Amino acid sequence: MRLLRVATCNLNQWAMDFDTNLRNVKESIARAKAAGAAVRVGPELELTGYGCEDHFLEQDTAAHAWECLKDILSGGYTDGILCSIGMPVIFKSVRYNCQVFCLNSKIVMIRPKISLANDGNYREFRWFSAWTFKDALVDFQLPLDISEVTSQDTVPFGYGFIQFLDVSLASETCEELFTANAPRIDLALNGVEVFVNASGSHHQLRKLSLRIDSMRNATLACGGVYMYANQQGCDGGRLYYDGCCCIAVNGDVVAQGSQFSLKDVEVLDALVDLDAVSSYRASVSSFREQASHRTKVPFVKVPYKLCKPFQSGMVPTGPVEVMYHRPEEEIAFGPSCWLWDYLRRSRASGFLLPLSGGADSSSVAAIVGCMCQLVVKDIENGDEQVKADAMRIGQYKDGEFPKDSRELAKRLFYTVYMGTENSSEGTRSRAKMLAEEIGSFHLDVPIDSIVSALLSLFERLTGKRPRYKVDGGSNTENLGLQNIQARIRMVLAFMMASLMPWVHNKSGFYLVLGSSNVDEGLRGYLTKYDCSSADINPIGSVSKQDLRAFLRWAAVHLHYSSLAEVEAAPPTAELEPIRADYNQLDEVDMGMTYEELSIYGRLRKIFRCGPVSMFQNLCHRWCGTLSPSEVADKVKHFFKYYAINRHKMTVLTPSYHAESYSPEDNRFDLRQFLYNARWPYQFRKIDELVQDMDKDGKWVNSTEGELRRRKGVRSAEGGGMGVVAVGSANPSAGS
């Protein structure tokens, strides 16, 4: 029985902070060695941090990575343990994303990434080149200062594996796990038993199962041990790397790390039986047949043993049940951890949130409350780094530290209700109640006097005073009056964030939190430079439907019972006067429901639909419920306001990335911001399709469709994408 103890890790790295990154790498190696591991793998580009972006183009970045590696090699950290360490390497003036394998203070091999990630949030081709030479390993000339430490002039560089006396090992890097022609296939057929994967994979709602299933299926098809490492935390941008380091053997997960955590270092180890891998493969006739005429892969021979001799009491680690968080938990824990990293690394003293009492701002408040709960829990569990950060941020003195989440929230979280004559008592009381449950320092600030002062100034300048629509004003006046209130709140929020610490004799500044959701961004249902303009936004990529589910969950599990009332209230901006016969509602203003918006967003981004293909898709999905002309009106209405408001996305607050149909303009959803909002060609094609469908007479309401329409039943067909949009607002409405 060949037994091998292996270790993987989650590391909370910070792009370009080499001190922090090096410290975490060293700590993870030390913990792996203490556990008796013979192999340790860390995250992708762990020495620099994955999110360096254009800093990768600087020679300094690669040079500093080599300096950090020299520190590791000269410090004896790799003595007795094979370490896979991620860093950028420049070879013949070309930059590669590499795993450097080190053992006993020497470099065994450098393995460049062969399949780069270049979609969604990833832009690896901007900074790196893929290694395309698979026939042979080449010699890499080491930097002189590294040669002095390792006593090596050159080391093998390229695609291949490492053959030890008792085990063969190779690597895949992040994206290569998901490619159609994955490296592990040829490697497994060449006898490689252990695969290490250094990853820089970010969180997205409902995404973890894809990652876990890929590892399971990889080792189920080919057999083997798969070690997966990942970053965890905010390393300086919109992404939260969600850890979940794990180890899989022959299709079973035998160890799984946390997906969301405040820890800087988490190490996971397992004792694996390599003979079980050999036995598994030998039992599959198709594997034996394919291995007999395999494509040979180059390798490096290392005369060293990694396995432990069998002793009584040594039992291979058995399978575990994989832990998946519910989407509501993902919304709670992912943004909470992201906010904590941002807070401690920005050196801010806390957060300020304009709390309106509505679903969006209440969700953000609950997330901050959840963050405070996580901090106190980790302190109770003995995390000294979290404790030190919390003491500094909360400005505790004389050895005091946070022991209660509400007390911590009082120190680092301001909430402000900025009401006007258009605000209701319901939202005011809900905001106050939630603030009390969380423990924030809450202020109720009326802003009518500021609004009145601006309107008086405008009247002196122009001789005119705008009126609300309910008072006989035009749409232009009505929108202008709403925007004044919204923008005053933004200015006041930033003023209070900078000055309230001074008022309370505290040092530092507060970060302003935004609370617009992904659907409002997609539709443009927000005022440019209102409270959607903030320092950061933890829910900017979360849908309204998911937020409402989160509110229901948080009311129970975070013990903020007032959130149940918040969730039950209809969404409203409260920017227009309330009358007996009129109450402003979001979905009426937008001319579409949030549910419809979610569908439009998924079709536009995930399924890459333009106006015509979206119309065709929705005609199929809403067959028997809406006529072709009704579907056409809805599609045109969406694309009209999407185009008109697209410019707002260019200045939207940096938001936590959570949703696959996010319209975030920075890198995820790159589009122009000046459109012909009439879409003349596309809309004409839709009109032609409607005429053809009406002419053919084939659009017949089915009995099933009629029943759905009468009952308002939502269709689950099409992977949950079909929805019966019964009772949606007038498509000609909107602002």
Swiss-Prot record:
Keyword ATP-binding part of the UniProt annotation: yes
Gene Ontology terms: cellular component: cytoplasm
Annotated transmembrane regions: none
HAMAP family noted in UniProt: NadE_glutamine_dep (MF_02090)
Residues annotated as binding ATP: 354-361
Naturally occurring in which organism (per UniProt): Oryza sativa subsp. indica (Rice)
Active-site residues (renumbered): 44, 113, 174, 356
SUPFAM superfamilies per UniProt: Adenine nucleotide alpha hydrolases-like (SSF52402), Carbon-nitrogen hydrolase (SSF56317)
One of the GO BP terms on file: NAD biosynthetic process
Alphabetized Gene3D superfamilies for the sequence: Carbon-nitrogen hydrolase, HUPs
Enzyme Commission no: 6.3.5.1
Presence of keyword Protein biosynthesis: no
GO MF term set: ATP binding; glutaminase activity; NAD+ synthase (glutamine-hydrolyzing) activity
Keywords: ATP-binding, Ligase, NAD, Nucleotide-binding
InterPro entries linked to this entry: C-N_Hydrolase, C-N_Hydrolase_sf, Gln-dep_NAD_synthase, NAD/GMP_synthase, NAD_synthase, Rossmann-like_a/b/a_fold
Official protein name in the record: Glutamine-dependent NAD(+) synthetase
One Pfam entry name: CN_hydrolase
Catalytic activity field: deamido-NAD(+) + L-glutamine + ATP + H2O = L-glutamate + AMP + diphosphate + NAD(+) + H(+)
